[in-house]
Design a protein with these regions (language model features):
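Conserved donor-binding/catalytic core segment of Leloir-type glycosyltransferases
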Residues: 154-170, 176-181, 187
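Short hydrophobic beta-strand element within catalytic cores of glycosyltransferases
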Residues: 241, 250-253
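Active-site donor-binding segments of glycosyltransferases and PAPS-dependent sulfotransferases
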Residues: 1-70, 207
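Carbohydrate-associated surface elements
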Residues: 120, 142
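Membrane-proximal helix-turn-helix segments that form the acceptor-binding/catalytic region
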Residues: 94-114
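Nucleotide-activated donor-binding/catalytic signature segment of Leloir-type glycosyltransferases, i.e.
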Residues: 190, 196-219
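Aromatic "clamp/platform" in nucleotide-sugar-dependent glycosyltransferases that forms part
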Residues: 233
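Conserved acidic donor-binding segment of nucleotide-sugar-dependent glycosyltransferases
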Residues: 253, 268-275, 282-289
Length: 330
């Protein structure tokens, strides 16, 4: 298993595969390697690529972000996890062309199998890169066993609405517009920009924010909140939905891309581009006790799909498939 050297304050990939590896069966023999250098600049990436080539084994799994590690590896022994195609949407011009070729087009050609974390990401990837869709397998993210059900009486007088993330796609300005005038407190996880602070003040939002939390501190934020607002405009998966589900909190999330797939019947789905629709979803959760209870009950059931043991088993089966493929190609 080949992992990137973590970027500053960005450990989502590492958290995901840490939980998966812990759930591997004891008879699975594996080695886990982390690139020596962060994925920045030509020479660092070249070193990482050569190092990966020297350490390759019978089956090689590149766990995301460092797609270029596959360049020198044996194609029939290698699989690559692609988490999303977000950077292709953000970049433009020559930078986008180079990124597309080096991170998507070439790696897809250089590996035996690809895993993605949602059907939505699979469809998106196939829009960008032509390949046999049977080469792409959907294996979802898993929910850490550290998350536990934590029932809590709903604070109907002043609910705490949890917002995870402040990046552009997390849609904080639209959320602020949507909840303006609703008695509640917006608890924001992530660093706020001056512009975002101005927007929150302009809509007279009662809010607090915190960043750089540990995993256990993030879990505590879910426990203390009354509901999750996750009206994102772009996700490859949408892990906060499942984290709120397993904790026992009702969820308002977007009706686009991977989020309906991940949420199932365990969230109130809204149009993330329509502040009024977001507002209606929040008010429905705040005002309808039976609806809240239904979402919470459905959430507990939904979260079972993403247990580490279930996800790990899917990876193990794929490793066996890649191994047999490499044996037959000799």
């Amino acid at each position: 298993m080949f992992n990137r050297k973590p970027q500053d304050a960005n450990f989502s990939v590492e958290r995901l595969f840490k939980d998966i590896v812990k759930a591997f069966p004891p008879n699975l023999i594996y080695n886990s390697y982390t690139s020596k250098f962060k994925s920045r600049g030509f020479w660092s990436r070249l070193y990482n690529t050569v190092e990966a080539f020297c350490k390759q084994g019978d089956v090689n799994h590149i766990t995301g972000d460092v797609h270029y590690l596959c360049y020198l590896m044996s194609k029939n022994k290698t699989l690559l996890t692609i988490l999303d195609c977000g950077n292709l949407k953000r970049l433009n011009g020559i930078r986008r062309t180079i990124f597309y070729f080096l991170w998507f087009w070439l790696p897809v050609k250089k590996v035996a199998m690809i895993t993605v974390i949602s059907e939505s990401t699979k469809k998106e990837l196939l829009q960008y890169v032509r390949c046999d869709e049977r080469k792409i397998r959907v294996i979802p993210c898993c929910i850490s066993d550290d998350f536990k059900p934590s029932p809590k009486a709903f604070n109907s007088s002043n609910p705490v609405l949890l917002q995870i993330g402040t990046a552009y796609n997390k849609n904080l300005p639209k959320v602020a517009e949507a909840i303006s005038g609703i008695p509640c407190h917006l608890r924001i996880i992530g660093k706020l920009s001056e512009e975002q602070i101005s927007q929150l003040l302009a809509f007279d939002i009662s809010y607090s924010s915190v960043s750089n939390l540990t995993d256990l501190e993030i879990i505590d934020e879910y426990i203390k909140c009354d509901a999750l607002i996750f009206a994102s405009t772009y996700e490859g998966f949408g892990m906060p939905i499942v984290e709120a589900n397993i904790t026992g909190r009702p969820v308002v999330t977007s009706n686009i891309l991977s989020m309906p797939e991940v949420a199932g019947n365990a969230a109130c789905l809204v149009d993330p581009y329509d502040a009024e629709d977001i507002r209606k979803g929040v008010l429905k959760i705040f005002s309808d006790e039976d609806y809240r209870k239904t979402l919470v009950a459905n959430g507990y059931q939904n979260a079972r799909r993403f247990k580490p043991a279930i996800v790990a088993e899917q990876y193990v089966e794929l490793y066996k498939e890649v191994y047999l493929l490499s044996m037959h190609s000799k």
